[in-house]
């Protein structure tokens, strides 16, 4: 990650603690600025990284084109750029390979890279779909994310059971019939 300034983050966290009326040097809080900096280094590790590079080198198919590949229930976490609170959920990715396939382990790497930056779920969904369409040469892509947002569950409306579902479809999977079939296969309940 480029541009990560640990000292500034620690100073800013200490200032926030002081601004809410706490003593950042008291026992229990004295290490908090360092802990938050550690967490932010992890949360934002995708900044400056190329998600498409995470796809690796596609493996050419020996006999033309393959059928649909679906990887379901991929856990992810990101940080909402509006409140800097986490959103945590699962991703489902379906793609229709062109002349090559990508390693299944590469799919979560792409998601992790794109999620590890200040995000909104809607954009994250689109970025994942765009990465597979462009970087993997997929003829069709469908991405469904379902997540619980800290800004909905822990503050404001405090709806602890609320989930947000977003969907992005590209290529052949943008067709309504193909999209509906994949959603049924994924079994995630998205409309």
UniProtKB/Swiss-Prot annotation:
<dbReference type="GO" id="GO:0046654">
    <property type="term" value="P:tetrahydrofolate biosynthetic process"/>
</dbReference>
<feature type="binding site">
    <location>
        <position position="83"/>
    </location>
    <ligand>
        <name>Zn(2+)</name>
    </ligand>
</feature>
<keyword id="KW-0378">Hydrolase</keyword>
<keyword id="KW-0479">Metal-binding</keyword>
<dbReference type="GO" id="GO:0005737">
    <property type="term" value="C:cytoplasm"/>
</dbReference>
<dbReference type="InterPro" id="IPR043133">
    <property type="entry name" value="GTP-CH-I_C/QueF"/>
</dbReference>
<feature type="binding site">
    <location>
        <position position="80"/>
    </location>
    <ligand>
        <name>Zn(2+)</name>
    </ligand>
</feature>
<keyword id="KW-0342">GTP-binding</keyword>
<dbReference type="InterPro" id="IPR001474">
    <property type="entry name" value="GTP_CycHdrlase_I"/>
</dbReference>
<dbReference type="GO" id="GO:0006730">
    <property type="term" value="P:one-carbon metabolic process"/>
</dbReference>
<protein>
    <recommendedName>
        <fullName>GTP cyclohydrolase 1</fullName>
        <ecNumber>3.5.4.16</ecNumber>
    </recommendedName>
</protein>
<dbReference type="GO" id="GO:0003934">
    <property type="term" value="F:GTP cyclohydrolase I activity"/>
</dbReference>
<comment type="pathway">
    <text>Cofactor biosynthesis; 7,8-dihydroneopterin triphosphate biosynthesis; 7,8-dihydroneopterin triphosphate from GTP: step 1/1.</text>
</comment>
<dbReference type="GO" id="GO:0008270">
    <property type="term" value="F:zinc ion binding"/>
</dbReference>
<feature type="binding site">
    <location>
        <position position="151"/>
    </location>
    <ligand>
        <name>Zn(2+)</name>
    </ligand>
</feature>
<keyword id="KW-0547">Nucleotide-binding</keyword>
<comment type="subunit">
    <text>Toroid-shaped homodecamer, composed of two pentamers of five dimers.</text>
</comment>
<dbReference type="InterPro" id="IPR020602">
    <property type="entry name" value="GTP_CycHdrlase_I_dom"/>
</dbReference>
<keyword id="KW-0554">One-carbon metabolism</keyword>
<keyword id="KW-0862">Zinc</keyword>
<dbReference type="InterPro" id="IPR043134">
    <property type="entry name" value="GTP-CH-I_N"/>
</dbReference>
<dbReference type="GO" id="GO:0005525">
    <property type="term" value="F:GTP binding"/>
</dbReference>
<dbReference type="GO" id="GO:0006729">
    <property type="term" value="P:tetrahydrobiopterin biosynthetic process"/>
</dbReference>
<dbReference type="InterPro" id="IPR018234">
    <property type="entry name" value="GTP_CycHdrlase_I_CS"/>
</dbReference>
<dbReference type="Pfam" id="PF01227">
    <property type="entry name" value="GTP_cyclohydroI"/>
</dbReference>
<comment type="similarity">
    <text>Belongs to the GTP cyclohydrolase I family.</text>
</comment>
């Amino acid at each position: 990650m480029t541009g990560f300034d640990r000292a500034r983050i620690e100073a800013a966290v200490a200032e926030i603690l002081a601004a809410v009326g706490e003593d950042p040097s008291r026992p229990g809080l004295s290490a908090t600025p360092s802990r938050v900096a550690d967490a932010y280094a992890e949360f934002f590790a995708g900044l400056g990284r190329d998600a498409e590079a995470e796809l690796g080198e596609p493996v050419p198919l020996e006999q033309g084109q393959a059928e649909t590949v679906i990887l379901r229930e991929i856990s992810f976490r990101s940080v909402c750029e509006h409140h800097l609170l986490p959103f945590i959920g699962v991703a489902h990715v379906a793609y229709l390979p062109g002349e090559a396939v990508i390693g299944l382990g590469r799919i979560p790497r792409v998601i992790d890279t794109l999620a590890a930056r200040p995000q909104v779920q809607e954009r994250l969904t689109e970025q994942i779909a765009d990465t597979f369409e462009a970087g993997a040469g997929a003829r069709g892509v469908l991405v469904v994310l379902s997540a619980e947002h800290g800004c909905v569950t822990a503050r404001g409306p405090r709806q602890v059971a609320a989930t947000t579902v977003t969907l992005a479809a590209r290529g052949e999977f943008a067709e309504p019939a193909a999209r509906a079939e994949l959603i049924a296969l994924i079994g995630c309940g998205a409309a």
